[in-house]
Structures are given as C-alpha cells and as structure tokens.
Amino acid sequence: MKNIEKFEQLFNQFLQCVTTLQEALNVSFAEALTETFDNLENNKIKVEMGAPDEETVAKLGEMYKKLNYDELPRQTKIQVFSYLALKAVNDDGRDVNQMPTPPVLATVIALIMQKLLPDKELDILDPAIGTGNLLYSVINQLKDRNHSKNLYRLYGIDNDEDMLNLADVAAHLNDLDIELYCQDAILPWMVPSPDAVVSDLPIGYYPLDENVKDFATKSDKGHSFAHLLFIEQIIKNLKPGGFGFLLVPKSILSGKVGADFMPWLTKKVYLKSIIELPDSMFQNKFNQKSILVFQNHGGSAASSEVFLTKLDSLKSEEALVNFNVKLNEWYTKTIH
C-alpha cells in the first residue's frame, strides 16, 4: 500500500475514534479530539459520571487497539493530530483566525530567528497560540539547527479553552514544555515579559472598546483593529531589545492604514524586516499577509538597514534556498 493511502487509512481510523467519543459525550469535535489523545497517551479511557457508557468504552478499547498507537512514529502522531485539529476548526464553526498557519511560513520565520536571536536561554511567547502549530514548528526547526539543544521556555495565550487544550496535546506530542494561559491577550498579560514573540495575529475588529481606551492604535470611531492592538500590546510587553516575528495583514504596511500605523511603529521599535508573501498563498488580496520583524528599544538594540524582500513562491526548495542566500547577505552586511 502506498504511503499516502496508508496515512489516509490511519487518519480515518483516528477520525472514527474521535467521532465515536464525540457522539457518546455530546461535545464539540475539538473537545473529543483532546480527550481521544489524552486517552491514547495515558493508555486509559477517561470516564466521568458514567460517560462514556460501558458499551462505548468497550468499543473505543477495540478501536484504540487497532491503531497500535504506541508503535506509531512521533511524527506520524503529530501529522494526524494536525489534520484533525484543522478539522476541529472547520467542523466546530470556529473563527477563520484559528486556522493553522502553513508550515512553510514557520520555516521562513525560523530562518530569520536563527540569525537574530542570541544563543542563550530565551522566553518565547505566542499571544494568539490557537492549536500551537506555528510556535511548535518554529521551535522544532530552531532545535534541529541547534543540534537538538532546546534553549527555549515557551508560553502561549488564547481566550479559547478548547484551542488551549489542543495546544497542550500538540506540545506533548512534540515533546515540548509550555505554560498556557486562558485570557484575552489585549488585557494585561499574566506571563513573564518574553525575549521574543512569534505569532500569526488574529485579523478583524476587537469588540470591547472599553478595554482599549489607553491604546495609541485604537480607532477614533467604532471598534479598533485587533491586529494593531496586538502589535501595541506585544511592544508593551516585550523585554528591552526583545524581538517580534509576526504574520500581519499586508494592508497595515501601506495604504491608508499604513500611513497612520507605520510612522507610529517606527518610533516605537527598530524595524528589522518586512517580507511580502506570495499572492498565490491567499484566496484574495484582502487576506494577503506579510512577515513583520522588529526589535524593541533598549538593551543593545540599534537601528539597521531593513531587510525587504518579496517571496514569489514557496512551493519549491529552491525558493527557500534563494531566500536564505538573500537573508545571509543582509545579515553579513548589516547586523554581523
């Protein structure tokens, strides 16, 4: 059987386990997914107040046996879980902002982080962590390039408990430790000030005007843009000299919004890089994103020439190699 067919078969077996539990407990797909992986990791089916019933427990026990879960490679478990988490966002009618970030963007961000971050223990946070796939993918790539040394203490914030539970399972599957906080990230953070923030920022309007009356990026009329508020909150909370590696709407970097926002941003931080992503990655021009990299004032931070580039494609290995060559040239000339 071809690898892809094998994986499809395995995915469908996992899917059946999740939907069986979902029906028995009458919960969302995300909740059933979290509990399924908890059951498999702990090798025990959790029963609370008689649910799931004995018949379902027996049925799940047989289904779990057929998975041979303990024999599966870690990477396969992560892959299956990632696809099921994507289904959870779709099926539960969740916000489009909770859709996982394409893995190739984690590679681009990891390449930049490797150049800019100091080689020491660092606190790294995603204040809109969702299922955790962007942060974990970035950290795994940094670890791989660092001879498996894990120099990072990880933190995540989200206001959706179901997403945090999925992020918790994903961290466990990736063999990463993380502290997760359920809160509105526009309110004061409960986490320590991070050395770096990595995030695919939520896009849209923030509905609670009262919470943002002291924000410089708030709107004069009506609701404010959540993505601008997030950037301001990140800058407020980063350590002096700390870095932001953010996926942001392309529209905030130019046009009417950019005309107001960019002068404010460049007074607050040192811009390091703006990377325009391929148009083909997005359904329409309103969804287009760029990678924004900046360094907070303070510490040994200093201004430097900004690394500006557009990625025309990310479909080939060659595109990433070319990007890395340009990045190295900029780093050698400007930073190093």
What spans do the regions from the language model cover?
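Short acidic, glycine/Ser/Thr-rich loop/turn "cap" segments at secondary-structure junctions
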Residues: 87-98, 122
